[in-house]
Every structure is written in structure tokens, then in C-alpha cells.
């Protein structure tokens, strides 16, 4: 196991010396991204619509759509958005909340609670069951609502129902939303639902669409922090490759831990854990099956943790990732890492000015590649099934 420890420069918060990862090509000059610090609330990194300064007198509010708005995830999410956790403490928002007609009364209750919180950043709430009203001029769309898989339901039947839902929402994005709208799909199967919406929003850039794998990344980083015995905030750059499903590929080979084993030091995750058997035989299945484990324990799917992941995904996308860090987002493949073009696939990305860029040049070992091939196969099969219904 390669040992590599660097000391942090306390003045600049940047790391000195060579990159510790052989998989990054060796020295600092070849590393595909810098290791180091950086601040999230930096106007030079933020999307043009987001205000991160203290002057909010004439700031235009961001219109944020949340679908499935009367559901559990949305209930946790919208209070986080309204309180400034997604766009920062200086950016006002207008919430557009959409749900199906039978949830209209519950939606009214959610609106009352939002009003009762008296959030300074929440300018207004548009709660509706009408898709045109919901999607009109929105800047950010968080598509949480989807048809859940019931007992005995075949995956192709689930895809058929959700293709219908996300076809309609893709068409609504194309027709009513702002041309620069940023779209995050959460409802499962998220990758293929995102692809369906993207294909029906043909006037919008493919780079405006993404699906959520941040929850998987957060789960993985939490497990690593617990295994090593450090704060989760010290664990960085764990990658989730592929589908948001049980074929997802958690990859720690490019991750590092700050202030480990002592303050002021940094060490790669594999040598910090120092247990290849655990990483390969226990850690990966634990991450892959965490959602099912939560359901088994609480008889409900993840809600608060999903909302937290949504906030982190959008915040990093629109405010920018920190220097030396990448995050996992399922985005439209451009062929990187031999992933076929035309899939929504989770990659490591960095974000700047509201645009994501896939991190290039990472070496992938044979074991990880085999798992990536399996998740590619699953996504191709999902796409083929979804397209048969779409067409």
C-alpha cells in the first residue's frame, strides 16, 4: 500500500509538494486537479444568477421548482432552500411547488408552514397542480416526484410509468422554463428519468441536466470517516461512478483525508483505511445497499439525507466546488472514461460559473473497471427500455 503524506501550508491553505496519488500521474504538474483549500461563497465561481455578496437590495430572486412537493423528501428540502442553505444567505428565492391533484390539500399545509417560518429570503410561494404554472420561467428545477416501485412491480413497468411522467416534464421544461434552467432529477430511476426529460427538452443544453448521486457519495464518505475515526469533513473526493442503483461503483482510490493521521497532514484514503479486504468486500456493498437498509429500518425511504444531498449537489453546481475537490454528479456522458455517449452517468466533476466539467486523467484499476462495465450495461438496458416507451 502506497504511503503518501503531505504537510499543509498554514498560510495559504494549499498543499505543498507532489500529488500523493500515482493514479493522478505523479507530480503536481500532472495532477488533473489541485489539492487544497478554497471558499464556496466566491462570486467569481458562482452562477451568474446567484448573488453571494451582502448587498441584496435589488437582487432578482431565483425561481426554484420542486415536484412531488407534498412528499417526504420535498418536505425536508424546501425549508432548507428557503433558509438559504442552497444558494447562500444573500440570494432570495421564489418556490414553485408542484404535486398531483389528490395532494392539493397537503400542499396547502406545506405552504402555511413555509409562511409561518417567516424566512427573509423566501419572497413568495407558488403552489399548484398545473404543470404550466409550475414550470413557467423557472431557473432551477428539482424533479423529486416519481412513481414508486410497488411490491411485485417489474422494473420495465416502473420505467414505463416514469417515462410518461418525465416526458411531460421534459416537454414543460422545453416550453415554459428559463432557457438557462438547471435541472436535477431525484425521482428514481433517476439517471434514466433525467435522460427522458433531457430528450424531450431538445431546445435546452444537455449540460443543464443532472441526476442525484450525491447521497451515495455522502454515504460513502461517512462510512470512511467512521472506519478511520475522523470527522467526515476531512474526507474528500470519494467517487460514485454510474447508475444510482445497486450497480453504482463507490471508488476511494482518488480520495484523501485531511488532518490525518495528525493535524496538518493529508493521506490517501486507501492507505488511511489500510484494509483492502474491507474496502472491496464490505464497503462497496454497504454503500450500494444503504438505501434498502434505511427502508428496512424505518419502513420509509431516505428523506432528510436525500434533501441534504440535493442541497449539496445544487449548491456546488451553482456556487462552485472548492479548490482541490470534486463531487459526484450524474451527467450526460461525452465519452469520458469510455462511457458511451448518450447516457446519464455519474462522474467526478468540478463546477465553475454554473457549469460542470468531468475530471479527466484518473486511472481506473481493473476491479473498478469491471464494476463500471456492469453499471454501464444496466444503464444501456434501462435506456433501451425507456426509449421503446418514449417512441
Swiss-Prot record:
Gene3D superfamilies: Lactate dehydrogenase/glycoside hydrolase, family 4, C-terminal, NAD(P)-binding Rossmann-like Domain. CDD domains: MDH_cytoplasmic_cytosolic. It is an enzyme of class 1 (oxidoreductase). Substrate binds at residues 149, 155, 188, 219. Keywords: NAD, Oxidoreductase, Tricarboxylic acid cycle. It holds the Pfam family Ldh_1_C. One of its GO terms (molecular function) is L-malate dehydrogenase (NAD+) activity. GO terms for biological process: malate metabolic process; NADH metabolic process; oxaloacetate metabolic process; tricarboxylic acid cycle. NAD(+) binds at residues 68-74, 162, 169, 186-188. It catalyses: (S)-malate + NAD(+) = oxaloacetate + NADH + H(+). The active site is at residue 244. Its EC number is 1.1.1.37. The keyword NAD applies. It comes from the Eukaryota. Catalyzes the reversible oxidation of malate to oxaloacetate. Belongs to the LDH/MDH superfamily. MDH type 2 family. Homodimer. PANTHER family: MALATE DEHYDROGENASE. HAMAP family: Malate_dehydrog_2 (MF_01517). This is Probable malate dehydrogenase 1. It comes from Dictyostelium discoideum.
Amino acid at each position: 500500500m502506497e504511503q503518501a503524506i503531505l504537510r499543509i501550508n498554514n498560510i495559504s491553505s494549499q498543499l505543498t509538494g507532489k500529488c500523493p496519488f500515482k493514479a493522478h500521474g505523479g507530480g503536481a504538474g500532472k495532477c488533473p486537479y489541485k489539492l487544497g483549500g478554497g471558499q464556496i461563497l466566491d462570486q467569481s465561481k458562482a452562477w451568474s444568477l446567484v448573488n453571494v455578496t451582502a448587498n441584496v437590495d435589488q437582487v432578482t430572486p431565483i425561481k426554484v421548482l420542486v415536484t412531488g412537493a407534498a412528499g417526504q423528501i420535498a418536505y425536508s428540502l424546501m425549508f432548507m432552500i428557503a433558509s438559504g442553505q442552497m444558494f447562500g444567505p444573500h440570494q432570495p428565492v421564489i418556490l414553485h411547488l408542484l404535486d398531483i391533484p389528490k395532494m392539493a390539500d397537503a400542499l396547502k399545509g406545506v405552504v402555511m408552514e413555509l409562511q409561518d417560518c417567516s424566512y427573509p429570503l423566501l419572497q413568495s410561494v407558488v403552489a399548484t397542480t398545473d404543470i404550466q404554472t409550475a414550470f413557467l420561467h423557472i431557473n432551477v428545477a428539482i424533479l423529486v416526484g416519481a412513481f414508486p416501485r410497488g411490491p411485485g412491480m417489474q422494473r420495465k413497468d416502473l420505467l414505463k410509468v416514469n417515462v410518461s411522467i418525465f416526458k411531460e416534464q421534459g416537454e414543460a421544461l422545453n416550453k415554459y422554463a428559463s432557457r438557462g434552467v438547471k435541472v436535477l432529477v431525484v425521482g428514481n430511476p433517476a439517471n434514466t428519468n433525467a435522460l427522458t426529460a433531457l430528450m424531450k427538452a431538445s431546445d435546452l443544453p444537455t449540460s443543464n441536466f443532472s441526476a442525484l448521486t450525491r447521497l451515495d457519495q455522502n454515504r460513502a464518505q461517512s462510512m470512511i470517516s467512521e472506519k478511520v475515526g475522523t470527522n467526515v469533513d476531512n474526507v474528500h473526493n470519494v467517487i460514485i461512478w454510474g447508475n444510482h442503483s445497486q450497480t453504482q461503483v463507490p471508488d476511494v482510490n482518488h480520495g484523501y483525508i485531511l488532518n490525518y493521521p495528525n493535524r496538518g497532514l493529508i493521506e490517501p484514503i486507501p492507505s488511511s483505511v489500510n484494509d483492502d479486504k474491507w474496502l472491496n468486500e464490505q464497503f462497496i456493498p454497504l454503500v450500494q445497499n444503504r438505501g434498502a437498509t434505511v427502508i428496512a429500518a424505518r419502513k420509509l425511504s431516505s428523506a432528510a439525507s436525500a434533501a441534504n444531498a440535493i442541497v449539496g449537489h445544487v449548491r456546488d453546481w451553482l456556487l462552485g466546488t472548492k479548490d482541490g475537490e470534486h463531487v459526484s454528479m450524474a451527467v450526460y456522458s461525452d465519452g469520458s472514461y469510455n462511457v458511451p455517449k448518450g447516457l446519464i452517468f455519474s462522474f467526478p466533476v468540478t463546477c465553475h460559473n454554473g457549469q460542470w466539467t468531468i475530471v479527466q486523467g484518473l486511472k481506473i484499476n481493473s476491479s473498478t473497471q469491471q464494476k463500471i462495465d456492469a453499471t454501464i450495461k444496466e444503464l444501456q438496458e434501462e435506456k433501451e427500455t425507456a426509449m421503446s416507451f418514449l417512441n
